[in-house]
Amino acid sequence: MIENFISDPHNVKFVENFFNSELFSSLSTDYPIVMISDHYVAEELLPPILDFMDNLGYRVILLTFPPGEKNKTWETFISLQNQLIDQGVSLGSTIIGIGGGIILDMAGFLASTYCRGVPLFLIPTTLTAMIDASIGGKNGINLRGFKNRLGTFYPPKDVWICPEFLATLPKKEWLHGIPEAIKHGCIADAYIWEFLDNCRDRLFSSQEILHEFIKRNCMVKAAIVAKDPKDQNLRKTLNFGHTIAHAIETLSKGHISHGLAVSVGMMIEMRISLESGIMKNPYLIEQLDNLLKYFCLPTALQELGSLIPQHLHNEFYHPENILHTLGYDKKNLSKKAVRMVMVEHLGRAASCNGAYCATPHTDILYEVLKSECHVVCNN
């Protein structure tokens, strides 16, 4: 079964069985297909896929790079660009990114810049990539440790979501995708929280429930992006929790995964929303805390300590260092004015006069961060 369930801002297909020749019908056999992935995915998932494509008559050029956020860099990007040239890849070729969010970001940036743009297809294999990274056309790489500092808007021709890939992942990788779904509930669709509350015990055991969950989240993100494809206003709401999260990832030198960073980032940014007077219901923080904890996700900076090398603790648990890193966030209009998404109530991000992000008072921001770091320093 192939279901084209999203067409705006780009096509997204839901695929129950990846090994279906109909799925590949839009790809020409006249030119090579360039598949971008990492070493792990290439070894664990790609052999049967490459055999299948070979039987369909495709010539596939496989380019891989080492897994992990630390390799989402300019050096990796240039290395892959050089390999495209060495392989004689031309405008007729199509780039396919297959894997998690890091791979899809790299594939998108490559496709958008090589020969000023070649066709791009995305095949997400993690929950985070399925409900977030593959939707919307954003891509990018890190520069000097700062998240997604270089990137473009480049919508894929198609996204193929095949949940059977999730079966190859350890449970913790499934859980790392949950914060993005909870974020969608915070900013746009309160029903997602209700869905998680009602179905959380069966989310990963019922195929029907999992499929509904994935589709719902994809449609939430697609609807937002369709209204603001270039991230001028409404789309910024998708960054809820990410301002703090990106600082966490930067200061941890890549030791904290994106999903765990977003989990803690949402808790901190919701506290800032409350302290700033934008959110009126303090119980919402308790609800968020309980929902994240049910899925064994962290809700405070303190819970990330065991994942960070000891020699980084002093730098990581320092409010001034976090504030300094926040100054480099892409949403900022200036380095001194940190901007972040505020939640008004469940299912609604604050419009902030149409900007959909605001600059919290420095004292509020500092005190919230200080309280997070203080707990660790006193233990």
UniProtKB/Swiss-Prot annotation:
Biological process (GO) annotations held by this record are: amino acid biosynthetic process; aromatic amino acid family biosynthetic process; chorismate biosynthetic process
Q: Does the keyword RNA-binding apply?
A: no
Enzyme Commission no:
4.2.3.4
KW Zinc (keyword) present: yes
Keywords in alphabetical order: Amino-acid biosynthesis, Aromatic amino acid biosynthesis, Cobalt, Cytoplasm, Lyase, Metal-binding, NAD, Nucleotide-binding, Zinc
The UniProt annotation places NAD(+) binding at 67-72, 101-105, 125-126, 138, 147
Subcellular location(s): the record lists: Cytoplasm
Please list which residues make up the signal peptide.
Answer: none
Query: Under the cellular component aspect of Gene Ontology, which terms does the record hold?
Result: cytoplasm
Q: Spell out the reaction equation it catalyses.
A: 7-phospho-2-dehydro-3-deoxy-D-arabino-heptonate = 3-dehydroquinate + phosphate
Q: Which cofactor does it need?
A: NAD(+); Co(2+); Zn(2+)
Which pathway? Answer: Metabolic intermediate biosynthesis; chorismate biosynthesis; chorismate from D-erythrose 4-phosphate and phosphoenolpyruvate: step 2/7
Cite the binding residues for Zn(2+).
180, 242, 258
**Cofactor binding note of this UniProt entry:** Binds 1 divalent metal cation per subunit. Can use either Co(2+) or Zn(2+).
GO molecular function annotation: 3-dehydroquinate synthase activity; metal ion binding; nucleotide binding
Q: Which family does it belong to?
A: Belongs to the sugar phosphate cyclases superfamily. Dehydroquinate synthase family.
Reported function:
Catalyzes the conversion of 3-deoxy-D-arabino-heptulosonate 7-phosphate (DAHP) to dehydroquinate (DHQ).
What this protein is called in its record is: 3-dehydroquinate synthase
